[in-house]
Amino acid sequence: VRALDNVDFAVAPGATLGLVGESGSGKSTAVLALLGLLGGAQVAARRMAFDGQDLLTTAPALRGRRIGAVFQDPSSTLNPAVTVGLQVAEPLLVHARLSRTEAWSQATALLAETGLARSATLMACYPHQLSGGMKQRVAIAMALATRPELLLLDEPTTALDVTVEAGILDLLEGLRARRALSLLLVSHNLGIIDRLCDRVTVLYAGRMVEAGPVRAVLARARHPYTRGLLAALPRLDRRGALAPIPGALPDLRQPDPGCNFRPRCPFAAAGCERPRALAGEEHQVRCHRVEEIASLAWPSPPSAPHASSAAATLLQTDGLVRRFGTVRAVDGVSLTIRRGEVLGLVGESGCGKSTLGRLMLRLLDADSGTLHFDTAAVPKIPLAAFRRRAQIVFQNPDTALNPRQNVATILRRPLHRFALARGAAVEEIARLLELVRLPPSYAARYPHQLSGGEKQRVGIARALASRPDFIVCDEPVSALDVSVQAAVLNLLAELRATLGLALLFISHDIGVIAHLADRVAVMYGGQILEEGPVAMVLSSPHHPYTAALLSAVPVVGARPTRQILPGDSGAVHGGIGCRFALRCPQRIGPICAEADPPWRDAAPGHRIRCHIPTEQL
């Protein structure tokens, strides 16, 4: 397998280079090659150097000293059995040869530099006691311990919600300025690349297809692949169907001597099978038809229709409450979802979104409050009829699908459970695979033989097997590449339109909500703070928390004024009063902490929960 093929890039002192592309494009392989961590793989390069030193021979000596690295999942980076303090101090003890006292003192200072409050206290904590954003800051502190000149960042914010992600990006910008750091940032989020990078290199199936200044490449993309990535990107300022890139990456065991994007390119023509080198000086592109297609738009699919506001109510919650010990995970939530409607639910990690979704399905018992489905009250132990009509699609298909069962067995179980197959299970499985745009042959495949997007399609097919009226989608696209994500989102919109499904779509990606949802509810500390039509809420947010969330979303080509919230992410005011009072930048006085805020109508169907009059927001 030739994972990288004639890839050239350089990172200038104090600059940031972005590497973008789908999973399998070679981004992480490039990072591991620079670190000398590819094991037995053969690395051939005309030149691979850092400050004049040959990385083919010196990478192990430079790694952890002059070159630092931060990876995607801090939970796998950090040792769960060792305190944070010892892990941050370790590179100082091993590489800098400091005494334990000096290393401990510097490690505490590093945690403070990465924006962690109470750094001295955190030194004694274990990783499981920290949030995802805090763990990533610890990983950054470890990478900075030996004062590296180059920091390699492999998807450092992928698993984080939008405000935590914005905080990490602010931190990286500050570190680059203070320490004159050079950064190599790998990400599939083009908004992050646009915000943080000076230059960008686009990789496809191991080859560079476009490279140049980030503003030029993202504002005037010239290669069809880059244009396809941008067309598939969910944006706050754009609604309607997304335009996923058709097909899949080529087989790297059989490299195509010509354009390897040709089978997926809507602009491919005779001659594209010939080899082509990068052309251009400052803005380089590898495409035979770059001038011919400059004025052609990327094909856009038709938008699916949205639900009618006159549709009947399907699901209604009234005052749902769920506590875990002293934590009020869901606190008095009342919502309505109509037939065929998509309600988006957004908020930071830990705000209660997933708990609310499970309460709506009676997968968790509510401490109080009522749930009605199709006008009938749903008991704590629901009947099989409710289970058939209300289903869920989970975030991670790797844990949701049984690795020992093939796709046919996975789909057959709900058919038998609800007595729907009636002796025609094979035909019904074929119908379900067709619904989610998978070929019939996939029935014999096992989960490990599927891509991430294909696994999620199987998860959706399983939810559809019982012919439900309502599905909870709990972060179903958060782990997917932008193009695969676009295809899954379009599929859900299509299924909603053709089958009349109602969806509760839970996500921390507000751009995704903008494309799929009819209405959106914003959640914080177990309560809904704002609710209304998605176009209205996202274009004219009234609640201070919603405004802060939207300001944190990185948007290609836009520079919104960031509203930085004080306090720790997810800090909740206990007892009576506004849950957001501890972090609210517009807090008006003691009333915010001493009285529950009222619901106020900002417009027909658009309401907020706040003490501040709507005309002042």
Locate each region found by the language model.
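P-loop NTP-binding/switch modules centered on Walker-like glycine-rich loops
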Residues: 22, 36, 156, 160-241, ...
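Helix-to-loop junction immediately C-terminal to a conserved catalytic motif
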Residues: 35, 361
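Conserved ABC transporter NBD signature motif
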Residues: 43-54, 369-377, 386
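ABC ATPase NBD coupling module
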Residues: 54-68, 86, 94, 215-221, ...
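Conserved ABC ATPase "signature" region
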Residues: 102-121, 230, 424-441, 550
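Charged, flexible cofactor/metal-binding loops and thiol motifs
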Residues: 120, 213-314, 533-617
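A short, proline-enriched helix->beta-strand linker immediately N-terminal to the Walker B motif
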Residues: 145-149, 465-469
